[in-house]
Amino acid sequence: MSEVTRSLLQRWGASFRRGADFDSWGQLVEAIDEYQILARHLQKEAQAQHNNSEFTEEQKKTIGKIATCLELRSAALQSTQSQEEFKLEDLKKLEPILKNILTYNKEFPFDVQPVPLRRILAPGEEENLEFEEDEEEGGAGAGSPDSFPARVPGTLLPRLPSEPGMTLLTIRIEKIGLKDAGQCIDPYITVSVKDLNGIDLTPVQDTPVASRKEDTYVHFNVDIELQKHVEKLTKGAAIFFEFKHYKPKKRFTSTKCFAFMEMDEIKPGPIVIELYKKPTDFKRKKLQLLTKKPLYLHLHQTLHKE
């Protein structure tokens, strides 16, 4: 084993243990961050070209499967469902496999597949990988978007059953104003509801790719059904909208900007909300406007009450 590989395995092992420790202590935000960042590192190695990797194709496949399991555990921690799909004790079975990846030759304990090449960055990772976005955006529109793999369709959820005296909210995402709207490849919006600590209160939903782009607008015209009755949302909660697009040069999906709506803004009719610079600040502590130009996210709210 080369010194480079030994050091790499030690870093992976330390990251794995940190995530599992946070998980067992109930520090879910920290655990999710650690799991997602490690998953991206494993994913990168699993997808490395043969001559750029010290691992065999079979070992890279196993590394990719471990990345998938980290994603599954991260998703389970963010889920509002009581039944976790992928448990901590399941994840812990993978630590010795990762540690001994060079000699591991048994069947993988879980029926999963390596995550696909196109990826979404973990919180905090974008700052390390991206430089000034404006400098790059000039070339982002070069080439046809059709030459890249099609993104998975949106993950929109149906409206919840109505309950007497309870209010449901439908948010129509109409359009978003951006100075370089026409250059965005496969743009979509991730919608989540977070408490003041950035913890998910409902399942996260992705819109399908935008219906059309023109000048300074990306049009969606899609309805989001809030997956919780308005009265059941905790004090200080907010609905977040993260605008994401594919960056072919770097082969990942990046958050360009975000917006959010607080509980006192929930009222029927149209609303426009300001756009903020990434990374997404779910705790709303250090907000920076994306631009001084009059560009916003345009929404329309409909309340349903029995």
UniProtKB/Swiss-Prot annotation:
Disulfide bonds: none annotated. Residues 27-62 form a coiled coil. PROSITE patterns: C2_AIDA (PS51911). GO terms for biological process: determination of ventral identity; dorsal/ventral pattern formation; negative regulation of JNK cascade; negative regulation of JUN kinase activity; negative regulation of protein-containing complex assembly. The keyword Phosphoprotein applies. Residues 157-304 form the C2 Aida-type domain. Residues 128-138 have a biased composition (Acidic residues). InterPro entries: Aida_C, AIDA_N, AIDA_N_sf, C2_domain_sf. Residues 128-153 are annotated as: Disordered. It holds the Pfam family Aida_C2. Keywords: Coiled coil, Developmental protein, Phosphoprotein. It comes from the Eukaryota. Widely expressed in adult tissues, with highest expression in the heart and skeletal muscle. One of its GO terms (cellular component) is cytoplasm. Residues 154-221 are annotated as: Axin-binding. GO terms for molecular function: phosphatidylinositol binding; protein domain specific binding. The modification Phosphoserine is found at residue 144. Signal peptide: none annotated. Interacts with AXIN1. Belongs to the AIDA family. Acts as a ventralizing factor during embryogenesis. Inhibits axin-mediated JNK activation by binding axin and disrupting axin homodimerization. This in turn antagonizes a Wnt/beta-catenin-independent dorsalization pathway activated by AXIN/JNK-signaling. This is Axin interactor, dorsalization-associated protein. It comes from Homo sapiens.
